[in-house]
């Protein structure tokens, strides 16, 4: 089995120079404890399939306590999930990504103040596997994000995103296919 080497012919690793493997192991244990405490104290209703990395600053809330997370999901600091959501395996959220409700307040009731209006219908958001979401992206509830998609920083996603595409903008539009000329698997 061959291993890639760096410029100085040493095997490449994810360990930063000057950082010991023991320090990384201790940090990994501390992260696992922090994650378990997060779900125990703040988000018992969330269903998890496997490893999740979640900073304390992330807010998970759902009108029907219906959030499920796949294996290897990582949230950046300040992310917000305020809708029912199903998130697949191997999904990366950058900082301050928001999944927000679509009909949190009914605005179509004459004579009823928005403050007093009941909640509208709830829409579940689906994020496929192997998805990368950039800094400060916003998703309106009810969208489906296909497997392998990349959402650029600052995007506002109001429509479904096809698999293996890169989208960006406000509203988000397809920028390109991830694997031009290849059949994605």
Residue positions per predicted region:
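Hydrophobic transmembrane signal anchors and adjacent membrane-proximal interface regions, especially
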Residues: 11-15, 43, 92, 131, ...
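Flexible, glycine/small-residue-enriched loop-and-beta-strand segment within the central core
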Residues: 56-69, 74-144, 170-171, 177-184
């Amino acid at each position: 089995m061959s291993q890639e080497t760096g410029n100085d012919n040493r095997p490449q690793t994810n360990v930063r120079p000057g950082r010991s493997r023991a320090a990384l192991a201790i940090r990994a244990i501390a992260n696992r404890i922090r994650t378990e405490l997060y779900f125990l104290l703040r988000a018992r209703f969330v269903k998890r399939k496997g490893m999740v990395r979640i900073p304390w600053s992330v807010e998970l809330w759902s009108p029907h306590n219906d959030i499920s997370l796949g294996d290897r999901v990582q949230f950046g600091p300040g992310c917000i999930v305020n809708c029912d959501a199903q998130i697949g395996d191997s999904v990366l959220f950058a900082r301050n990504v928001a999944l927000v409700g679509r009909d949190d307040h009914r605005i179509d009731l004459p004579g009823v103040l928005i403050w007093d209006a009941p909640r509208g219908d709830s829409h579940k958001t689906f994020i496929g596997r192997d998805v990368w979401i950039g800094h400060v992206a916003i998703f309106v509830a009810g969208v489906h994000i296909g497997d392998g998609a990349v959402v650029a920083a600052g995007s506002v996603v109001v429509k479904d995103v096809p698999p293996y595409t890169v989208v960006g903008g406000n509203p988000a539009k397809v920028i390109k296919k991830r694997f031009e000329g290849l059949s994605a698997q």
